[in-house]
UniProtKB/Swiss-Prot annotation:
Name of the featured protein: Auxin response factor 7
Family: Belongs to the ARF family.
Entry's Gene Ontology cellular component terms: nucleus
Tissue: Expressed in the whole plant.
Residue spans binding DNA: 127-229
Keywords: Activator, Auxin signaling pathway, Developmental protein, DNA-binding, Nucleus, Transcription, Transcription regulation
Compositionally biased spans, kind Polar residues: 464-489, 637-651, 678-710, 791-808, 903-921
Gene: ARF7
Residues in PB1 domain copies: 1037-1130
GO biological process annotation, one example: leaf development
Disulfide bond positions: none
Length: 1164
């Protein structure tokens, strides 16, 4: 051993630290989880944690530590200086820090604290090995793993026999040590012989201690020691020498806090149970994720040989660790429970900045993606899977409303922020819902949040919390629920809005409702006065026209009404074309941004008008007078005005109250007509009821109303009354247009309207002249929706394709006359109503920008479905070409029919591209040659659910498909997926499947293919299974891949094994290493697997059931491969494809990273 060199002190110009030892070696000896904050940054000092370090070092219980009432539980300090030291006797590392409490801090200090978190102080190239008994013996040497020697040590000259060299390394005190490095033995291995025994005896190393070799930035070989955690009598005198220092640390902190003076502390990372000097940025980040009972989290622990591992746990309590001396302290205020039974020496209480919150409450294998759930019929058992039932039993606070994920959310992959917050407040099972207001704060200013958080309060429940909007789940929460067979319409998802917009809108709604009730009383009085004035005018008109007989007026009125019926029947197709032309000119309402007050006023009008206008046709039919034909048009408007003053009722009671209001108002109007001396004729009532039903079935136009008024005018009515009636009819036309447009946003109004339409339909079938069938009414309601933009024009009519108004509607997909390039987000989504039971998904999203006209609500001919609704692309958060994941339950009966139809269907043509049978299909954009080409999708005759009522597709480019897809044989799901995922060098996760649980998911990543436009249509296989696209049975992987270097990979079914012993025995037999895998302690082979968190774990640590559920792939590693993983220091450094549980369609989890021919295995 050579004499130690002099230790110089050199300041660090970047961090302001004064170092006398190598920083990389210090951090390597301190541990992989230690990273000291830089000098000049802000830190949070916890005296309670400092007391724990003193108690652990002096082996003195915390009960004997005195209390300091003037010392708060935390101090915001400026870190002036950091000095890295090591004990000269034991080589234990520690740091000396100079802190000064501060009350105010500037932005530069905050930035310095934030930048300190991003600095990686651990060495890049190092090797750590735990010493064995042979390594510490006096007659032996130190065995170095092959990959560690090749990576850290200089290269050997293998031309020598035996190959050997001399190594020179420096320890943490800058002492130089010389060793002989030789490559010998059988089998041959790297050994350190000469000089090693001297090093072991001088440093007093024992079995269990660790030795580190690192190569710093100057290519110098450094040597460090990390001793095992043993009970030591006391620390060295350089850290703490007496009990007075034990008590003095708190007194020094209290004095510094009172005078804002600097004080010095010593931090021993190997002895301290947890770091008590926390960077301010780390502390603030932890405060943003406020915890609640039942929250899942991960925590990183150090393992052997400088490795780390994440353990999962659950927060079981929030309370003070020491409520007497440290009240409202955030130090170890979380009581936790670990998932694994063998917790070992893991603590039972942690601090919030020590954990990583799992941002989904169900972070359990499989990954947190639930497919849409549908509540079953009353009294019928739900066919939920075992995995989902187990999740509900384990976490009862989950309900069926937590379903679809937000694909664009990066901080909350399972749920959106508002969904999770509403779940916490709505469900009473969460005990901390009232105490903990939220899981994440609102978008607050960082500086203001820090000042409010750290300046005055110590209550963790008041730190950076935010309030969620009142009510239930927000409009951004897409809920897909089964509906009973009595309810023909499903609740449509509302367009997503931001949190601030929801709060503003709800506040305006509450204030406007009170104002609306006050105005309704005054409006009702004015309407009654207008009614009396109109009755007086009618009486005067009756006296002036007494020269005409009553019988002649009745005959003339009947003739006019019959002529009106014939004209309306002939003009019905022309009205449809007129409506479609008007639909083209309507601007896109969703692209406009009205003020919040205008929004809420428009909402109130849409809420009131539909309820007030539902039964105008029936009331008008009961209250017509034969003498004055003008009252036929006047009374519905009066009824509408009187009903407008009613208060909005909930959906459950609005129907009954509407009937009661109808009966009361009809009695009042009948009494008013008795004063006029009018008599009602039964024949006129029948005819007028027909005309009123026409008003409900077809949207009226102003010309239509003017024609009716002219035909039904009494001979003696003057011009002023005619103008008044025309104005009334115009207002009524506008009210009905608003009424039909509001159907999209008021699902309970849709329910009432459909019941009313069914009643009218029955009455029309009894009469000799029935007007329109139900499906045509729905198509007319669909035509009232606003278009996307003025450039997106729908075809004006479907009559050119042979569609009659009374034939079953077909699905027409056409291209516009001119190619439009709408902005991003200008696509069309189509949602279909739920009409029948089953387990098919209730929606079909399509990010296609093809302009398609949906002429009916559905094309499955099992039953009539609700109207298909087109909503703008802004209603659902989609980005670029990313196809939203669809998760659907598989119907075995439908699957058998799909298989049977697949055998009988013909092969693909040039215009037909089959992509998937049960997942997602892609329609490629049409080219210039077929923009004006229309094709008609046939009606499917599947005995399945009729919810998937949209065929989302477009014409296929005649030039692109045969050359690059069909001619090359891309006619299977796997080939198409590989083509899409590998095109342009973009790698995506495709086709995730699993066999060990009943949940089956699929994820398709679609890159930005230049030859394909953004017109990608996503359809459910329930629609595409029996038409132009032949069905194909989906491959499902039920085996787990096992690999071993030098051998051909095998596949096994882990479900058929009963435990680890059978698994090890069978794997050893498969790969010809019988007897070498059964005992993991003495075996040279290590059996590892990749779990659902993409971590490489040792087989046998977890319970067998958890292993079966979470294994993705298995690897048999040799001892040299395990040492290389330890050398890299990152057990989770091998990227793994996105798979769920046991294997997947997308290939081997080790492919491209660790295979027999890969030169970069484990970052080698």
């Amino acid at each position: 051993m050579k004499a130690p060199s002099s230790n110089g002190v050199s300041p660090n110009p970047v961090e302001g630290e004064r170092r006398n030892i190598n920083s990389e070696l210090w951090h390597a000896c301190a541990g992989p989880l230690i990273s000291l904050p830089p000098a000049g940054s802000l830190v949070v000092y916890f005296p309670q944690g400092h007391s724990e370090q003193v108690a652990a070092s002096m082996q003195k219980q915390t009960d004997f530590i005195p209390s300091y009432p003037n010392l708060p539980s935390k101090l915001i300090c400026m870190l002036h200086n950091v000095t890295l030291n090591a004990d000269p006797e034991t080589d234990e590392v520690y740091a000396q820090m100079t802190l000064q409490p501060v009350n105010k801090y500037d932005r530069d200090a905050l930035l310095a604290s934030d930048m300190g978190l991003k600095l990686n102080r651990q060495p890049n190239e190092f090797f750590c090995k735990t010493l064995t008994a042979s390594d510490t013996s006096t007659h032996g040497g130190f065995s170095v793993p092959r990959r560690a020697a090749e990576k850290i040590f200089p290269a050997l000259d293998f031309s020598m026999q035996p190959p050997c060299q001399e190594l020179v390394a420096k320890d943490i005190h800058d002492n130089t040590w010389t060793f002989r490095h030789i490559y010998r033995g059988q089998p041959k291995r790297h050994l350190l012989t000469t000089g090693w025994s001297v090093f072991v005896s001088t440093k007093r190393l024992f079995a269990g201690d660790s030795v580190l070799f690192i190569r710093d930035g100057k290519a110098q070989l450094l040597l460090g020691i990390r001793r095992a955690n043993r009970q030591q009598p006391a620390l060295s005198s350089s850290v703490i020498s007496s009990d007075s220092m034990h008590i003095g640390v708190l007194a020094a902190a209290a004095h510094a806090n009172a005078n804002n003076s600097p004080f010095t502390i010593f931090y021993n990372p190997r002895a301290a149970p947890a770091e008590f000097v926390v960077p301010l940025a780390k502390y603030t980040k932890a405060m943003y994720a406020q915890v609640s009972l039942g929250m899942r989290f991960r925590m990183i622990f150090e393992t052997e040989e400088c490795g780390v591992r994440r353990y999962m746990g659950t927060v079981t309590g929030i309370s003070d660790l020491d409520p007497v001396r440290w009240k409202n302290s955030q130090w170890r205020n979380l009581q936790i429970g670990w998932d694994e039974s063998a917790a070992g020496d893991r603590p039972s209480r942690v601090s919030v900045w020590d954990i990583e919150p799992v941002l989904t409450p169900f972070y359990i294998c499989p990954p947190p993606f639930f497919r849409p759930r549908f509540s079953g019929q009353p009294g019928m058992p739900d066919d939920e899977t075992d995995m989902e039932s187990a999740l509900k039993r384990a976490m009862p606070w989950l309900d069926n409303s937590l379903e679809m994920k937000d694909p664009s959310s990066t901080i909350f992959p399972g749920l959106s922020l508002v969904q999770w917050m509403n779940m916490q407040q709505q469900n009473g099972q969460l005990p901390s819902a009232a105490a903990q207001p939220g899981f994440f704060p609102s978008m607050l200013s960082p500086t203001a949040a820090l000042h409010n958080n750290l300046g005055g309060t110590d209550d963790p429940s008041k730190l950076l919390s935010f309030q969620t909007p009142h009510g239930g789940i927000s409009s951004s929460n897409l809920q897909f629920n089964k509906q009973n067979q009595q309810a023909p319409m499903s609740q449509l998802p509302q367009p997503p809005t931001t949190l601030s917009q929801q709060q503003q809108l709800q506040q305006l709604l509450h204030s406007s409702l009170n104002h609306q009730q006050q105005q309704s009383q005054s409006q009702q009085q004015q309407q009654q006065q207008q009614l009396l004035q109109q009755q007086q005018q009618l009486q005067s008109q009756q006296h002036s026209n007494n020269n005409q007989s009553q019988s002649q007026q009745q005959q003339q009125l009947l003739q006019q009404q019959q002529q009106q019926q014939l004209q309306q029947q002939h003009q019905q197709p022309l009205q449809q074309q007129t409506q479609q032309q008007q639909l083209r000119t309507q601007p896109l309402q969703s692209h406009s941004h009205p003020q919040p007050q205008q929004l809420q006023q428009h909402k109130l009008q849409q809420l009131q008008v539909p309820q007030n206008q539902l039964y105008n046709g029936q009331q008008a039919a009961q209250q017509h007078q034969s003498q004055q034909a003008s009252t036929h048009h006047l009374q519905p408007q009066l009824v509408s005005g009187s009903m407008a003053s009613s208060v909005i009722t909930p959906p459950s009671s609005s129907l009954n109250q509407s009937f009661q209001q109808q009966q009361q108002q009809s009695k009042q109007l009948q009494q008013a007509h008795h004063h006029l001396g009018a008599s009602t004729s039964q024949s006129s009532v029948i005819e007028t009821s027909k005309s009123s039903s026409n008003l409900m079935s077809a949207p009226p136009q102003e010309t239509q109303f003017s024609r009716q008024v002219e035909q039904q005018q009494p001979p003696g009515l003057n011009g002023q009354n005619q103008q008044t009636l025309l104005q009334q009819k115009a207002h009524q036309a506008q009210a009905q247009q608003i009424f039909q447009q509001s159907l999209l946003e008021q699902p309970h109004i849709q329910f009432q309207l459909l019941q009313r339409l069914q009643q009218q339909q029955q009455q029309q079938f009894l009469s000799p002249q029935s007007q329109l069938p139900h499906h045509q009414l729905q198509s007319q309601q669909l035509q009232q929706l606003p278009t996307l933009s003025q450039g997106h024009q729908f075809p004006s009519s479907c009559t050119n394709n042979g569609l009659s108004t009374l034939q079953p509607p077909q699905m027409l997909v056409s291209r516009p006359q001119e190619k439009q390039n709408p902005p991003v987000g200008g696509g069309v989504k189509a949602y279909s109503g739920i009409t029948d039971g089953g387990d098919a998904p209730s929606s079909s999203t399509s990010p296609s920008t093809n302009n398609c006209q949906i002429s009916s609500s559905g094309f499955l001919n099992r039953s009539q479905s609700g109207p298909a609704i087109l909503i703008p692309d802004a209603a659902i958060d989609m980005s670029g070409n990313l196809v939203q994941d669809l998760y659907s339950k598989s119907d075995m009966r439908l699957k058998q029919e799909l298989v049977g139809q697949q055998k009988s269907k013909a092969s693909l043509t040039d215009h037909q591209l089959e992509a998937s049978a049960s997942g997602t299909s892609y329609g490629l954009d049409g080219g210039e040659n077929n923009r004006q080409q229309n094709f008609l999708a046939p009606t499917f005759g599947l005995d399945g659910d009729s919810r998937n009522s949209l065929l989302g597709g477009a014409n296929v480019d005649n030039g692109f498909v045969p050359d690059t897809l069909l001619s090359r044989g891309y006619d299977s799901q796997k080939d198409l997926q590989n083509m899409l995922s590998n095109y342009g060098g973009v790698t995506n996760d495709i086709g995730t499947e699993m066999s060990t649980s009943a949940v089956r998911t699929q994820s398709f990543g679609v890159p930005n293919v230049p030859a394909i436009s953004n017109d990608l249509a996503v359809n459910d296989a329930g629609v595409l299974g029996g038409g132009l696209w032949p069905a194909q049975t989906q491959r499902m992987r039920t085996y787990t891949k096992v690999q071993k270097r030098g051998s051909v990979g095998r596949s096994i079914d882990v479900n058929r094994y009963r435990g680890y012993d059978e698994l090890r025995h069978d794997l050893a037999r498969m790969f010809g290493i019988e007897g070498q895998l059964e005992d993991p302690q003495t075996s040279d082979w290590k059996l590892v697997y990749v779990d659902h968190e993409n971590d490489i774990l040792l087989v046998g640590d977890d319970p067998w059931e958890e292993f079966v559920n979470c294994v993705q792939s298995i690897k048999i590693l040799s001892s040299a491969e395990v040492q290389q993983m330890s050398l890299d220091g990152n057990f989770a450094g091998v990227p793994v494809t996105n798979q769920a549980c046991s294997g997947g369609d997308s290939g081997n989890a080790w492919r491209g990273h660790y295979d027999d021919n890969s030169a970069t295995s484990f970052n080698r």
